[in-house]
């Protein structure tokens, strides 16, 4: 009997599986509405002028290809912090934010989930209903039980505000709550500033751990406007997690341009947290 005789065929990814089916389809009139990528009229992913210029500069430098630091390119990490929290954020000046480059937003979520499993091994993870499918898979793979909180009301095509707050209030202290910071995937229905304040109040009162996921900064109302939820939580004094992705922003889907940011209570705490996050990264892909 082969070592792999009992291995079952895994189901296709609900999103990327559609792309595989599209590529296998021989019809010339097909349209790909599966994977969320921007294509021009020829069906190709355009390369942004800024990316072309950056690549040209980079190639001309003939830079060496040595190992990056475990937490990635320092200038990139700092730029991510400024985009998320604002260049003048007191949190940055106080050293209360650590940021590590990640393999896309998925990689940032994976790092965060693995680190949280060390911190809160018995926690429950709550994700919105509906949510990006990989949220459940990532946290379940890390060993967490995952449940839903009500979010979208199909009848009104709006947020189920009462249901969401009721479900968050019912979570035990120490539960991890995954929140879409902007451009909710898959509904596109976002919380208002007042909604975010209500969610923050519940999170603080119940002692929940917020994990904000932001893959579309700038695609909603603007760069700063889309970061409003992150900055609101930053002003609250809470410790929390932010996974961010710029793969779509730069039209560099295959480059996996992500980052994980963690907000701590002090510069000294940041140093300890970063040391442990780097260990998680090292055992994943560094």
Question: Where do the protein language model's features map onto the residues?
Answer:
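N-terminal "arm"/small-domain region of PLP-dependent enzymes with the aminotransferase-like
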Residues: 2-75, 79-82, 86
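Hydrophobic/aromatic beta-strand patches that form the interior of the parallel beta-sheet core
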Residues: 31, 126, 147, 211, ...
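Short acidic (Asp/Glu) and glycine-rich catalytic loops that position anionic groups and cofactors
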Residues: 31-35, 58-61, 145-146, 211, ...
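Short beta-strand segments
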Residues: 34, 180, 244
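Short catalytic/ligand-binding loop motif for oxyanion handling, primarily in non-cytosolic enzymes
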Residues: 39-43, 186-187, 251-252
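Conserved core of the PLP fold type I
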Residues: 57, 62-207, 211, 217-219, ...
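Conserved core segment of the aminotransferase class I/II
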Residues: 79, 235-286
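Catalytic metal-binding/acid-base residues of hydrolase active sites
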Residues: 215-216, 247
């Amino acid at each position: 009997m082969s070592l792999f005789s009992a291995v079952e065929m895994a189901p296709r990814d609900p999103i990327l599986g559609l792309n595989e089916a599209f590529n296998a389809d021989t019809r010339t009139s097909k349209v790909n509405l599966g994977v969320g990528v921007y294509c021009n009229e020829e069906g190709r992913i355009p390369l942004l002028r800024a990316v072309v210029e950056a690549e040209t500069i980079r190639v001309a430098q003939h830079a060496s290809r040595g190992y990056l630091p475990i937490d990635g390119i320092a200038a990139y990490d700092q730029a991510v912090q400024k985009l998320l929290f604002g260049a003048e954020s007191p949190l940055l000046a106080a050293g209360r934010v650590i940021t590590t480059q990640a393999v896309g937003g998925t990689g940032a979520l994976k790092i965060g989930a693995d680190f949280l499993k060390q911190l809160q091994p018995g926690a429950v993870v709550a994700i919105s209903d509906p949510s990006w499918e990989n949220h459940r898979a990532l946290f379940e793979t890390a060993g967490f039980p995952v449940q839903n909180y009500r979010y979208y009301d199909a009848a009104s095509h709006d947020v189920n505000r009462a249901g969401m707050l009721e479900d968050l209030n019912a979570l035990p202290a120490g539960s991890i709550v995954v929140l879409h910071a902007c451009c909710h995937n898959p509904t596109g229905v976002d919380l208002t500033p007042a909604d975010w304040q209500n969610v923050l109040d519940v999170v603080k009162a119940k002692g929940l751990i917020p994990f904000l996921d932001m893959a579309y900064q700038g695609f909603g109302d603007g760069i700063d406007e889309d970061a409003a939820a992150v900055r609101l939580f930053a002003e609250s004094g809470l410790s929390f997690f932010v996974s961010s992705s710029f793969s779509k922003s730069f039209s560099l889907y295959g480059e996996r341009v992500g980052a994980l940011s963690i907000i701590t209570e002090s510069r000294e705490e940041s140093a300890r947290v970063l040391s442990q996050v780097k260990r998680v990264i090292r055992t994943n892909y560094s």
